Amino acid sequence: MSRIGKKPVDLPAGVSASVSGQTIEIKGPKGTRAFKATDDVTLTVEDNVVTVTPRGKSKRARQQWGMSRTMVANLVTGVSEGFKKELEIQGVGYRAAMTGNTLKLNLGLSHDVDYTPPAGVTVTAPKQTEIVVEGIDEQLVGQVAANIRQWRKPEPYKGKGIRYKGEFVFRKEGKKK
């Protein structure tokens, strides 16, 4: 029995949901998102509450039950509040700046890195050492933040690089003479 799947998903004010077949569409103030569930679960909407129930007792149905409920909850959070990932840059001469829709990163490489985010995600640089990634799709926001971080991961000796805000970087001691 899935403890996560048993919980119903409440729809906040201003958010509506409609089910057609195995697809649920959630509309909110920040946009519209849809999710197609597998045939192992049933989606129902009653009184601003979305419930997910398994269609059988197979292991796959129980796995999809909790996963589908979490996906629906993420859709509701995305269209009502949105998702946000914050990155910080540490290192001498490491900078970020926005030029139009393109993020320009100066990371000590022989060239500047230009990154254009995909549709549905907004990237801003409030300071030269901060990057904010926002959007309604949690997976896409996380992937864009990971792609930006990939250009210069934090190194363990001085801690230079791009890291998530609040991320702990394991530090190593240098060679001893």
Curated annotation (Swiss-Prot):
One of its GO terms (biological process) is cytoplasmic translation. Keywords: Ribonucleoprotein, Ribosomal protein, RNA-binding, rRNA-binding. Transmembrane segments: none annotated. InterPro entries: Ribosomal_uL6-like, Ribosomal_uL6-like_a/b-dom_sf, Ribosomal_uL6_a/b-dom, Ribosomal_uL6_bac-type, Ribosomal_uL6_CS. It comes from the Bacteria. One of its GO terms (cellular component) is cytosolic large ribosomal subunit. The keyword Repeat does not apply. Gene3D superfamilies: Ribosomal protein L6, alpha-beta domain. GO terms for molecular function: rRNA binding; structural constituent of ribosome. NCBIfam families: L6_bact (TIGR03654). Belongs to the universal ribosomal protein uL6 family. This protein binds to the 23S rRNA, and is important in its secondary structure. It is located near the subunit interface in the base of the L7/L12 stalk, and near the tRNA binding site of the peptidyltransferase center. PANTHER family: 60S/50S RIBOSOMAL PROTEIN L6/L9, LARGE RIBOSOMAL SUBUNIT PROTEIN UL6M. Part of the 50S ribosomal subunit. This is Large ribosomal subunit protein uL6. It comes from Roseobacter denitrificans (strain ATCC 33942 / OCh 114).
